[in-house]
Amino acid sequence: MKLLVVDDSSTMRRIIKNTLSRLGYEDVLEAEHGVEAWEKLDANADTKVLITDWNMPEMNGLDLVKKVRADNRFKEIPIIMITTEGGKAEVITALKAGVNNYIVKPFTPQVLKEKLEVVLGTND
């Protein structure tokens, strides 16, 4: 299963990718910002999950989510936002934009596992 991780921090991308690898997800694409993420998503339409930060240069995560949701190819792709923006207003804004689940940094691998299971419908 192909996943796309978007974060301007190479350290955070590595942490997320390593966590996904331990969970059995090996086909993980990476992008540094929303513009690069859109290009990768456009070229890899078989991507099954998008995991994105909010605050990034060039195109932030919220604008990326809106662009993804506006494209019929990706209307149903599960999106998890992982960000430091943890206020109620931010969560509501993200959910209204089309985010399926929300994780506030810092987070544990267990939280990412559970959120992935929820968006993929594999939770028991």
From Swiss-Prot:
Q: Does the keyword Oxidoreductase apply?
A: no
Q: List localization entries.
A: Cytoplasm
Instruction: Quote the record's cofactor note.
Output: Binds 1 Mg(2+) ion per subunit.
Question: Which residues are listed for Mg(2+) binding in this entry?
Answer: D7, D8, D53, N55
Q: Which keywords describe this protein according to UniProt?
A: Chemotaxis, Cytoplasm, Flagellar rotation, Magnesium, Metal-binding, Phosphoprotein, Two-component regulatory system
Does Magnesium show up as a keyword for this record? yes
**What binding partners and quaternary form does the record give?**
Interacts (when phosphorylated) with FliM.
Could you tell me which residue ranges the Response regulatory domain spans? 2-120
Q: Which organism is it from?
A: Helicobacter pylori (strain J99 / ATCC 700824)
Q: Which GO terms describe its cellular component?
A: cytoplasm
Q: Which cofactor does it need?
A: Mg(2+)
One Pfam assignment? Response_reg
Predominant location: cytoplasm
List GO BP terms, alphabetically: archaeal or bacterial-type flagellum-dependent cell motility; chemotaxis; phosphorelay signal transduction system
Task: Outline what the protein does.
Answer: Chemotactic response regulator protein that modulates the rotation direction of bacterial flagellar motors. Plays an important role in the colonization and infection of Helicobacter pylori. Upon phosphorylation by CheA, interacts with the flagellar motor protein FliM to cause clockwise flagellar rotation and bacterial reversals, as opposed to straight swimming when CheY1 is not phosphorylated.
Q: Which GO terms describe its molecular function?
A: metal ion binding
Specify the protein name.
Chemotaxis protein CheY1
- List residues modified as 4-aspartylphosphate: D53
Question: What PTM annotation applies here?
Answer: Phosphorylated by CheAY. Dephosphorylated (inactivated) by CheZ.
